[in-house]
């Protein structure tokens, strides 16, 4: 404010002028503070709204994922899985495995099943061929849909001939051999036998095609939105694919089944006695064997599933338990043996053991 007399000479303000100036200053300060409070309230309201929406999303996902026919009470592990599903679009926020020079696998996902936390990931949402990790779904669908796995199944000549033409891994059943559903299950999981997988498909659904439909329906139920199956074995096919994230959902779900967990963590199994194999066939886990045969320590790993085709590379799903905490690791696309095993050993050592 300009305090000037009639002659233009600046003079000191009067008491009234000082009071007026101070009042205007106080009013301006009060207006600024009110504006700041309004802005703060709006910010808080926005944060509260976001939290409400997140809570609603979690509740909605829980409802969708509920498989108990109306029961929406989730266990701690189920809630952890829901939280991990929500994180799919946020994978970039998790620590990407940076030592690319020392890691052969193209896709990686390490999860703490107890908390649902993604500990380590690399290209986890990228769709790729998954080879015999497909058989995890084959086992799940068979376990859930065959009323009695003691039921007999006669291995067909056409299955044996087809697998031979594909140079596929087999458990060693003979054409015409009468085996049980349990034999087929262990045959598919431990030595990754195509005869076990195709036998399970026929035993469960009556045909390979009908069984594949069941596999895809289960994938949809589990929220495996980046997954599609075209066969029960994992043979290379452009239409048979998944990603590390989806496979973690499948593997976690499968491990909740006591029978699957027992099979996946077994190191050996002997099939029932038949005319063709009076002493049964001794099956050996390619997970246990893969670590041991290559001189790589298993650490806390107690089971899992291997996979290999030329297009898919070396794939591995492992289950580990340390200090009461459960972990699953999916690695896909390692260039050659034993890199999928050494990758697993390295990742567990760095992110779990330390």
Predicted segments with their positions:
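Perimembrane helix-loop junctions in membrane proteins
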Residues: 35, 53, 66-70
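Alpha-helical transmembrane segments of integral membrane proteins
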Residues: 42-46, 182, 261
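Hydrophobic single-pass membrane-insertion segments
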Residues: 58-72, 352
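N-terminal targeting leaders characterized by basic, low-complexity, disordered sequences
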Residues: 1-34
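Alpha-helical transmembrane segments
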Residues: 51-59
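N-terminal Sec-pathway targeting helices
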Residues: 33-51
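Domain-terminus/edge residues, biased toward the C-terminal soluble/receptor-binding domains
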Residues: 224-228, 236-354
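Active-site-adjacent loops and short helices of periplasmic peptidoglycan-processing enzymes
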Residues: 2-3, 8, 18-20, 67-245, ...
